[in-house]
Amino acid sequence: MAGGAVIENLSNRKLFVIFAGLLVIQIMFFLIGAWYAPSPSSYMEFEMITCRDETKGLSGEWIHRDNCQQISELSEYTPSSFDLREIVFIAKMPHTRDGIELEYSPWFQFLLGVLHVDVEYSEHFKYVAHAPLELEVRMGYRDKESKKNEWKELVTSNVTRILECTIAEDEKKAGGTYDCDMLDLFELGSSSYPFYLINIRIPINQQACQFDNKSANCQIGKLTGLRLIEIHQNGGFTLVWLWTKTFMTPVVAICLWWYYNRINQLARNPLLLERAILLLGLSLVILDFPIEWISLTYRIPFLLLISDLRQGLFYTVLFSFWLIFAGEHLIDDNTRNNLKSYRFNLSFIITASLGLLIYDLIERGIQLYDPFYSVWSSPTGSQIAYFAIFISAISTVAYFIFLFFKIARVWSTIKSKRSAQIYQTSENRRLKVEGVIYRFKFLMLFTLLCSAFTIAAYFMKQYGEAQLHGDEARDGFLTGSTSAFFTGAFGMCNIYVLLLLAMYAPSHKHYRGASQLIDENDDDEIMEDPSNQHTESNAMTTFLKPSTD
């Protein structure tokens, strides 16, 4: 049996069967998302009811539809004092439809709320660009066993958002309206309760505004109403997603254990490339593990944070592996199989990962106890977020420049050595080396395809989440029919890692304890080891290493 990895010793027929089977599985992942999974997210829109509270919130009483002294037209309402805290905007989530009280389900996984502010043009109450909007927000919840209006407090918070509005020239008249951007309001990392109630007060002291127009909410213009758009993950998508992860987790775990046993039974220490593949498989098992099943029974408010951390770990390991995968076929024997040789390139990945980790820990971490917090709501928080994202973006761009440079060098090295050496050898050896090169090229092309699809899926997910927080929340990428894209990307990542585990496992079926494997049926080795150090290595790596002649 020949030495090296499995990919170098399988027959073309077996490889074709394996690749054809993987292609069928990949198509199945796409079809599962296209046929069985609904769109990833859905939304509900609430026209917040305007109520009058004479106590101005001092009583601690929840204001809901049944005890609401409704204000029919806010623009015509005359308050009883200068303090406008007596005006309360309420929304009970979810809707009551056709007399049936709808419920939120743990299958929804998360709840996200964005706020739309209706501002009317007025010569007396003028809107000032970039006006800070201060809100006193109170969120309550109710269980199925509780009485209809028995609300328990979830969180109370004072939040500040920047109100960005524009108006056309022909709208600058009585009754004209501003076009205002959506505002982030809250984000819950789990859908733990079936019913929620929101009370919002906008603290405005009209007397203070007369003396200082920079007082709280004195520059927001003539506010006529609030609309709340709530977004959640579809339960049907969650079901398909969880069963897909549940099916793939043991498959990847078994393959990872098989791969570990293969490299552990060798008489040498694992190569750097083998250790990188092992770590990549482990990170995929962590990513695939369907911890979301637990959230269906128990309240896990930190589920979004865990999801982000798992995804960040996988992408960090995956990007590091791509560098090592390309680099191990280029560097010379003095530095090959040494992680220190990649410390410069890996520093870009570490920097980008740390930047995004800091941003995520601040945003998601604080939201664990204050879902109304947004890192973008304060100048200091915005600066930290922008700095972290900027450093991460620069590092990511630099990383991909190095990666594509290394891949280009690999292809160039293959071409030059192929023309210089292969055809000077025997026909049998030439055919073997041609097979090794062909299979390596295929895997490299599949790596490029997987990297492109993985990066596209990552950025499309980030773009979709940004849309959920902005003006395109109702028509965003994640609220469209994109389930096939995400299940397809998930399938490709798993297939790619499984292919690496299977194809790059040491091929030593009959020579488990040997330090060097030799083909008994061929005296002419595919790649001779001139140093005669008796270290089983990848044949492609041996072929591409610099000549010592």
UniProtKB/Swiss-Prot annotation:
- Please list the residue ranges that the record marks as compositionally biased, kind Polar residues: 530-549
Segments in the Lumenal topological domain = 36-236, 297-310, 367-383, 461-483
Q: Name one GO biological process term.
A: positive regulation of Wnt signaling pathway
Q: What happens when the gene is disrupted?
A: Embryonic lethal with severely defective embryonic morphogenesis with no endoderm and excess mesoderm. In addition, embryos have defective mitotic spindle orientation in the 8-cell stage ABar blastomere.
This protein's major location comes to membrane
Cellular localization per UniProt: Cell membrane; Early endosome membrane; Golgi apparatus membrane; Basal cell membrane
Give the signal sequence positions.
Answer: 1-34
Keywords associated with the record? Cell membrane, Developmental protein, Endosome, Golgi apparatus, Membrane, Signal, Transmembrane, Transmembrane helix, Wnt signaling pathway
User: Could you list which ranges are Cytoplasmic topological domains?
Assistant: 258-275, 332-345, 405-439, 505-549
Positions of the region Disordered? 524-549
What the protein does comes down to: Probable sorting receptor which regulates endocytosis and secretion of the wnt ligand egl-20. Recycling of mig-14 from the plasma membrane to the Golgi apparatus by the retromer complex is essential for its function. Its endosomal trafficking is regulated by its association with sorting nexin snx-3 on early endosomes and the mtm-6/mtm-9 myotubularin complex. Required in embryonic development for endoderm specification and the correct positioning and orientation of the mitotic spindles and division planes in blastomere cells.
The UniProt similarity line reads:
Belongs to the wntless family.
Name of the protein in its database record: Protein wntless homolog
Please give the organism. Answer: Caenorhabditis elegans
